[in-house]
């Protein structure tokens, strides 16, 4: 097959319709018997790191790639047939639509393979696909031929033919923009109108009498249920667009039998859904723009604070348009929102109120973010964390480190008294300027050995002082690596996948892919997938047990209070703290400072 002239790589394949849990390792095991593989990459979402459902495989020899295309297409992986085609580096062919045809009214049993087999007689096929949703086939699909002539031949032969006793439509593919333009043109010349809010006694004859004054009608229909009762709406189809438009202008909002009619252009369900979705997105965007920079998120609220008290606390900084404490069964959930009239007022409130104690707790105040934005930020923080511990010159390694090659999947995270380049989460507590200095020295970029005469809140036990060791014997396979991130999914990056020999103690996910793990003495290794699999109420407990052990060694007198304060953070931020002793050290300092300020304020109030 001559693929080079069409922008295809002679040895690169596109593999689509992948199950979300399919990894590079699985694809390597499946395709490696065909021939030598240079690289495999599963494409993933930038924010969530979840599979997008397709991958690219580069073979060393073009003949191996062609053999894989011929023999492995529609093979089943994890209960789902895959779809293979040549990888097109130039998107022009796909976007032009040349040779691409659209087939609709397909019978439900026709799948990708059946569609491919049916149309392969007309020419070489680049790809074929039946569109599915959660309920099964949607009844239409696409076949992309290598040439326009083959596509035209398929249309001339198959359009109007029976496939599995169902007459199908076959035509040239049209882009969404072109279809919407044609739909808009048809909408301007509509003749069919929709009449809603009809009284139960209005039948076809009554409806015809109401609209006959506007012109000649082709059909009139009142929709009824299975019992023959009116469903309260119907359709009137005129011969001319002008007549239909006149009927809409005069009858919309008119009272008939005590009810106000709605009269408008009749729309198909897909068109109505598309318009409603567009309106919803427009309203959502307008709402986000309206509250951008003026809506504040307030966390760690005392249980005694209600809407009025929250508004009173923040009212000194400007005009508040709304203040709401989120509740569940009339009990405060510990957080709320305050919306100001201008961004300047909101910024001032964040600056002055973040870290201030209201009631018995220090507040966390920040600009409100949508859940998707917050998750994306935390995901990027997690991805930018150091790939391996950096040991300082004064410390000898207390565990085996993996070889110096890209090894994201096999990397376990260890604590030590040496330095780990910190990944600082956003601070949640800020001591007031008039408060006393912290008894804990500020965290530096390199953690130095600490003497036993210093404050008991500044010595973090090294979590690498555990017996679990990761062997350094690895077999290197030259395919893409998996970097495990939040949610247990990995990001595909060029490099080498490290496959450990049998008998290693590295932590594995449910799919056999190694994951980053947090080791704390006295506890099992903790991975992101283990955390995600646990119920919500157990996730905080799993993290809290490990935090308590580390905080107890650093600041025993205040262990319980500091642990409780840190558990107010999101789980992903807590994982960042567990992986970086410097970040945890900084958080402990902040918590101690806040508690000291609170203690002094209580002492002042008593005096």
Swiss-Prot record:
Q: Does the keyword Cell membrane apply?
A: no
The PABC domain covers 523-600
Gene Ontology cellular-component terms for this entry are: cytoplasm
* Tissue specificity annotation: Expressed in ovary and testis.
Q: Which residues form the RRM domain?
A: 11-89, 99-175, 191-268, 294-370
The protein, known as: Polyadenylate-binding protein 1-like
Q: Which SUPFAM superfamilies match?
A: PABC (PABP) domain, RNA-binding domain, RBD
Alphabetized CDD domains for the sequence: RRM1_I_PABPs, RRM2_I_PABPs, RRM3_I_PABPs, RRM4_I_PABPs
Q: Where in the cell is it found?
A: Cytoplasm
Q: Encoded by which gene? A: Pabpc1l
Keywords for this entry? Cytoplasm, Differentiation, Oogenesis, Repeat, RNA-binding
Lineage of producing organism: Eukaryota, Metazoa, Chordata, Craniata, Vertebrata
Stated role? Poly(A)-binding protein involved in oocyte maturation and early embryo development. It is required for cytosolic mRNA polyadenylation and translational activation of maternally stored mRNA in oocytes.
Q: Which InterPro entries match?
A: Nucleotide-bd_a/b_plait_sf, PABP-dom, PABP_1234, PABP_HYD_C, PABP_RRM1, RBD_domain_sf, RRM2_I_PABPs, RRM_dom
Query: Of which family is this protein a member?
Result: Belongs to the polyadenylate-binding protein type-1 family.
Biological process (GO) annotations? chromatin remodeling; cytosolic mRNA polyadenylation; nucleus localization; oocyte maturation; transcription initiation-coupled chromatin remodeling
The disruption phenotype is: Knockout female are infertile, produce a significantly lower number of mature oocytes compared to wild-type female, and do not generate 2-cell embryos. Upon stimulation of maturation, PABPC1L-deficient oocytes fail to achieve translational activation of stored mRNAs including mRNAs for CCNB1, MOS and DAZL.
Is Cell inner membrane tagged as a keyword?
A: no
Q: What PROSITE patterns does the database record attribute to this sequence? A: PABC, RRM
GO MF terms, alphabetically ordered: poly(A) binding
